């Protein structure tokens, strides 16, 4: 089934940026889940949510109201990584397309428990990665994000999502 709208939940803005880029590329309207009250229940959607420990935030709420055609999780990990983990953690059906997009990290945009959790992550994972002598390029990127923050949002990261979307026929 082809989605007719993009809905998303964003915490620090990186997921919203990807949703806007997808909207530009596909021509689909795009709304935050909070602003989607006018979207009819059962509408086929492409859902984007930020990732926390493999969990696509607010996915279950979206899935209760809408027909989710595909899920994009946006996190700090490399684009295309963690797909099996995201599928398992969120109990996504095997036939549902799942995408993971690298977003970014901005400590200033975090609040409350999330700020505390990411401070702990920086102090544990960041220090562990910094000491690791044979880091992979993905680990170098993760370390850079943890230490310096920044955005890795890029239209190029959407290639798999766009290939999936434009490969669908209207009847699918």
Role assignments for model-derived ranges:
Residues 13-16, 80, 107, 155:
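Loop/helix-junction capping segments adjacent to catalytic residues or to phosphate/diphosphate-binding pockets
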Residues 24, 61, 84-88, 115, ...:
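Charged/polar, solvent-exposed surface patches and flexible loops
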Residues 120-172:
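Glycine-rich phosphate/pyrophosphate-binding loop and the adjoining helix
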Residues 34-113:
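Helix-loop-strand module that forms the ligand-binding subsite of alpha/beta enzymes
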Residues 103-129:
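Short, solvent-exposed beta-strand-terminating loops
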Residues 1-65, 163-172:
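N-terminal beta1-alpha1-beta2 submodule of the flavodoxin-like/Rossmannoid cofactor-binding fold
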Residues 24, 35-38, 42, 65-66, ...:
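Solvent-exposed, non-transmembrane amphipathic alpha-helical segments
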């Amino acid at each position: 089934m082809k989605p007719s709208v993009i809905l998303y939940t964003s915490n620090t803005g990186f997921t919203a940026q990807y949703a806007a880029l997808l909207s530009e590329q596909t021509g689909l309207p795009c709304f935050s889940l909070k602003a989607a009250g006018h979207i009819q229940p059962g509408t086929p959607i492409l859902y984007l949510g930020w990732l926390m420990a493999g969990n696509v935030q607010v996915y279950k709420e979206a899935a209760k109201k809408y027909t989710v055609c595909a899920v994009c999780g946006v996190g700090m990990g490399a684009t295309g990584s963690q797909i099996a983990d995201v599928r398992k953690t969120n109990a996504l059906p095997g036939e549902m397309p799942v995408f993971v997009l690298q977003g970014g990290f901005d400590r200033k945009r975090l609040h409350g428990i999330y700020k505390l959790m990411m401070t702990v992550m920086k102090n544990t994972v960041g220090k562990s990665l910094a000491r690791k002598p044979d880091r992979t390029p993905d680990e170098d990127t993760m370390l850079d994000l943890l230490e310096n923050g920044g955005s890795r949002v890029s239209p190029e990261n959407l290639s798999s999502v766009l290939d999936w979307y434009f490969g669908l026929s209207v009847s699918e």
